């Protein structure tokens, strides 16, 4: 691990421990989790963390179904957001609203935050519209995702 990675890891881990009375800003993945819970309240967000070839860490091969395709599109969306100068999608927070299952990215987000918010919003909406197949949870990636 490079010194830069260690510095980022330390900042992420230590910042919530500060003496400030204000709550720390959550990381983007926490916001994405909340978006998923907004559009798919019947499922735990963890159900999407290790699904198919693309939901979770990394991604390769052919998506196993429509839900996995949602994650592939989300990964590609993050890759596009990374092209914005200084944009790190996994750490970028944004302003959004959930109202009765409807997600809205609020105005006032900078270019990176707006892009990441839209990636997460579209993925959460896609998850809500795709069938969930329990057989595609925690699959053997080496065997099925070539």
UniProtKB/Swiss-Prot annotation:
Keywords: Blood coagulation cascade inhibiting toxin, Calcium, Disulfide bond, G-protein coupled acetylcholine receptor impairing toxin, G-protein coupled receptor impairing toxin, Hemostasis impairing toxin, Hydrolase, Lipid degradation, Lipid metabolism, Metal-binding, Neurotoxin, Secreted, Signal, Toxin
InterPro entries per record: PLipase_A2, PLipase_A2_Asp_AS, PLipase_A2_dom, PLipase_A2_dom_sf, PLipase_A2_His_AS
EC class: hydrolase
Cofactor(s) annotated in UniProt: Ca(2+)
Signal peptide range: 1-21
GO (cellular component) term, any one: extracellular region
Binding site for Ca(2+): 54, 56, 58, 75
Reactions mediated catalytically: a 1,2-diacyl-sn-glycero-3-phosphocholine + H2O = a 1-acyl-sn-glycero-3-phosphocholine + a fatty acid + H(+)
Location in the cell: Secreted
BP terms from Gene Ontology: arachidonate secretion; fatty acid biosynthetic process; lipid catabolic process; phospholipid metabolic process; positive regulation of fibroblast proliferation
Molecular functions per Gene Ontology: calcium ion binding; calcium-dependent phospholipase A2 activity; phospholipid binding; signaling receptor binding; toxin activity
Active site per UniProt: 74, 120
Similarity comment: family membership: Belongs to the phospholipase A2 family. Group I subfamily. D49 sub-subfamily.
Protein name in the entry: Acidic phospholipase A2 1
Species: Naja atra (Chinese cobra)
